[in-house]
Curated annotation (Swiss-Prot):
Heme 1 (or BL or b562) is low-potential and absorbs at about 562 nm, and heme 2 (or BH or b566) is high-potential and absorbs at about 566 nm. Its cofactor is heme b. The gene is MT-CYB. It comes from Odocoileus hemionus. Belongs to the cytochrome b family. InterPro entries: Cyt_b/b6_C (IPR005798), Cyt_b/b6_C_sf (IPR036150), Cyt_b/b6_N (IPR005797), Cytb/b6-like_sf (IPR027387), Cytochrome_b (IPR030689), Cytochrome_b_C_euk/bac (IPR048260), Cytochrome_b_N_euk/bac (IPR048259), Di-haem_cyt_TM (IPR016174). One of its GO terms (molecular function) is ubiquinol-cytochrome-c reductase activity. It is a multi-pass membrane protein. This is Cytochrome b. Heme b b562 binds at residues 83, 182. The keyword Membrane applies. The cytochrome bc1 complex contains 11 subunits: 3 respiratory subunits (MT-CYB, CYC1 and UQCRFS1), 2 core proteins (UQCRC1 and UQCRC2) and 6 low-molecular weight proteins (UQCRH/QCR6, UQCRB/QCR7, UQCRQ/QCR8, UQCR10/QCR9, UQCR11/QCR10 and a cleavage product of UQCRFS1). This cytochrome bc1 complex then forms a dimer. CDD domains: cytochrome_b_C (cd00290), Cytochrome_b_N (cd00284). Binds 2 heme b groups non-covalently. The chain crosses the membrane at residues 33-53, 77-98, 113-133, 178-198, 226-246, 288-308, 320-340, 347-367.
Length: 379
């Protein structure tokens, strides 16, 4: 008798995606982040659902409803902090996942890569609208500053901003619609993730060497299921250490002050995972230029397949490209640090230099280095 998992219409899909999926035999722990992102998404949807049961999206009661969750709801504090820190974990995994794709040339799977970039934008949008919901000082002013950036769009900018606000400032209408967006977007992310997987399974996974691995495949279960479980346990350990010992480590103290439109915080900054993009935005003195640089800092990922000049797919055997890649990572970390600093003398110039080098490395130095490496190998 044929196994039910191979014949049943629903179980067949699961089987082909997670059990009998032929996987390369040499994929490293950098390939764990896809499953970790899935776990993060499920965790965020579940904790978010329980938070939504007690949260009220009204300017008068939003802040106190979050306080009520932490003080009065059974285990509300742990749900709230798992959701807040789970978002940080989500982004750490996302950046690792994208970095892996850049390093090993996974961007040559065009559909998978482009849907991944759309996913990144969607997750960033979700995190932004979610950060507004507790209605603290940083929530309010973050929403005001970031939505205001759209006013830099010529001709339609001001109308667009007022349309998003639902009035002439960030107010009740804005909070209500942001809650609606924050509730629906994770389900759109889940649907996009399925499409992402669908396209990935059309081609099969890449591997560290970048060489086709059709001749050496192993079943996903049990080899990679057990490996993913280990990754999940480590992620859970790290998340729970954060939640139970330092829940506010990555948050902003200003968000424990209720939103006050009459009092601007001395230093408005987004969550830690957006600081690199925020630093690029601030490093350009012109408003429209800053907004374009902000969008391009992420959208540049779409150009990666076009900028690939090497005759090898992966960076595994390309030491010069490896050096450039890690310099790029160092620049992103520098930008993250600068984004959290006040706009003062040494930080301004460091931010501008790091921003210029970020674009320079991706657009010029990496393609040129790849060409040089081709010539060194006499290709």
């Amino acid at each position: 008798m044929t196994n039910i998992r191979k014949t049943h219409p629903l179980m067949k899909i699961v089987n082909n995606a997670f059990i009998d999926l032929p996987a390369p035999s040499n994929i490293s722990s950098w390939w764990n982040f896809g499953s970790l992102l899935g776990i993060c998404l499920i965790l965020q949807i579940l904790t978010g659902l329980f938070l939504a049961m007690h949260y009220t999206s009204d300017t008068m009661t939003a802040f106190s409803s979050v306080t009520h969750i932490c003080r009065d709801v059974n285990y509300g504090w742990i749900i709230r902090y798992m959701h807040a820190n789970g978002a940080s974990m989500f982004f750490i995994c996302l950046f690792m996942h994208v970095g892996r794709g850049l390093y090993y040339g996974s961007y040559t799977f065009l559909e998978t890569w482009n849907i991944g970039v759309i996913l990144l934008f969607t997750v960033m949008a979700t995190a932004f609208v979610g950060y507004v919901l507790p209605w603290g000082q940083m929530s309010f002013w973050g929403a005001t500053v970031i939505t205001n950036l759209l006013s830099a769009i010529p001709y339609i900018g001001t109308n667009l901003v007022e349309w998003i606000w639902g009035g002439f400032s960030v107010d009740k209408a804005t909070l209500t619609r942001f809650f609606a967006f924050h509730f629906i977007l994770p389900f759109i992310i889940a649907a996009l993730a399925m499409v992402h997987l669908l396209f990935l399974h059309e081609t099969g996974s890449n591997n560290p060497t970048g060489i086709p691995s059709d001749a050496d495949k192993i079943p996903f279960h049990p080899y990679y299921t057990i490996k993913d479980i280990l990754g999940a346990l480590l992620l859970t350990l790290f998340l729970m250490l954060l939640v139970l010992f330092a829940p506010d480590l990555l948050g902003d103290p200003d968000n424990y002050t209720p939103a006050n439109p009459l009092n601007t915080p001395p230093h408005i900054k987004p969550e830690c995972y957006f600081l690199f993009a925020y630093a690029i935005l601030r490093s350009i003195p012109n408003k429209l230029g800053g907004v374009l640089a902000l969008v391009l800092s992420i959208l540049i990922l779409v150009l990666m397949p076009l900028l690939h000049t090497s005759k090898q797919r992966s960076m595994m055997f390309r030491p010069f490209s490896q050096c450039l890649f890690w310099i790029l990572v160092a620049h992103l970390l520098t930008l993250t640090w600068i984004g959290g600093q006040p706009v003062e003398h040494p930080f301004i110039i460091i931010g501008q230099l790091a921003s210029i080098l970020y674009f320079l490395i991706i657009l010029v130095l990496m393609p040129v280095t790849s060409t040089i490496e081709n010539n060194l190998l006499k290709w």
